[in-house]
Amino acid sequence: CLYSADGGVPGDFHFQHYAARAMGGAGLVFTEMTCVAEDARITPGCAGLWTDAQEAAWARLVDFTHRHTQAKLCLQLGHAGRKGATKLMWDGIDQPLEAGAWPILSASAVPYFPHSQVPRAMTRADMDRIRDDFVAATRRAERCGFDMLELHCAHGYLLASFLSPLTNIRDDEYGGRIENRLRYPLEVFAAMRAAWPAAKPMSVRISATDWKDGGLTDGDCLAIARAFAAAGVDLVDVSTGQTVQDAEPVYGRMFQVPWSDMIRNEAGVATMCVGNITTADQVNTILGAGRADLVALARPHLANPSFTLHAAAQYGVRDIACPPQYLWGKDALLRNASREQADLRELRLKARPRSHAPSADALVSPNVG
């Protein structure tokens, strides 16, 4: 998330951010989690889609992207739940607001930190209202012209709070076994799917594990993926964790890929993997091994909006889309890429330490006739 909206309206920073990545060669650009109501925000700076002004701003971005690039745009919709009413990321991530907070909701009255605001456990009336908020935002997304829609059910936010047994301690039909914990998230998804054009894809983002004893199991993860697939999801965006503040994740390169692999190959559902994937070689290794259908890279694109174009140049791929205004730069990049790779190979050879192993002649025994 950019945490840079004013009144939920995406502004100039959002426009240049998403447009730059689209012009830089990315095939599919996901938005940040876009909130479906004012009280659905994580922070006061979160972007939303519940007003006409917000809709107009998003529509401008979509129109520009479609006119000037070949990229597709996916809008990610979500509700912060118990992780709402918090400070901007750079002021203290997940820390509660000291002033100006709004009431928050969750599956159960379980705060994120001991000092966080205690959320109110949702009633059936709350569920109806928030489901309708998601549907209203879905209809706005279609009017904006987005190509794809994603429902955020991960990272401990509202819908994720129903899925995890660490945050869902309800004793009604929405708590207990995984089938009950899935009930409300599936209800929201089904309502959105009915409002979203059948020809346009929908994905769902999930946390495949909570990285905490007593949390989601692999069996739960597969059940969640299968249930959403049966409800009409086209893709599962596989993330992990961020459910509870005392989780114990094990980080590393491509560390979330095993769950994408499991869902794709055991549940038979198309997946997108994310998380500490930083190079084009890693992407192609994942795809070539059949461990995901799509790979999302966020931080590499934060550092380099034209990451995809640079990756294509490294592979010698010339037919990657580029706005005509930037063709001279693309040509220079492709022309220089092979030279730079040759220079790097030469440098590595020169930097290789000299061998101290005996030569082949020295290993031949002398003729002592």
Model segments located where?
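Flavin-dependent oxidoreductase catalytic cores
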Residues: 1-369
